[in-house]
């Protein structure tokens, strides 16, 4: 009987009482999923504060086990995230284009899996290598 509002975390940045940026997160059973971010200003590191640091802080406070920061971004590794596969679903209403996208995604997936393996062999910069 949960309501959607109980499953959403919206992190907002204000400047002079005006909303200038926000990050949208969804709260799962044991995972906080970061999904969308937007800003109308260019403030250094604001993206990291809203999308990563505030999300991690919320997850710790709420005892949420994982923060899934979404697809792409080598910069996430420097912030303690490990490389993982993520999935999405798209509908393309053009059979020729659908085939082209399918072929590209198959090739891309092989390369991404190689990159994930290489990155994870290096380990998280915050892991305790002695354990």
Language-model region placement:
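A sequence-composition feature that detects small, non-aromatic residues
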Residues: 13, 21-23, 55, 59, ...
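A conserved beta-strand-loop-helix scaffold within acyl/acetyltransferase catalytic domains
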Residues: 1-44, 106, 123-131
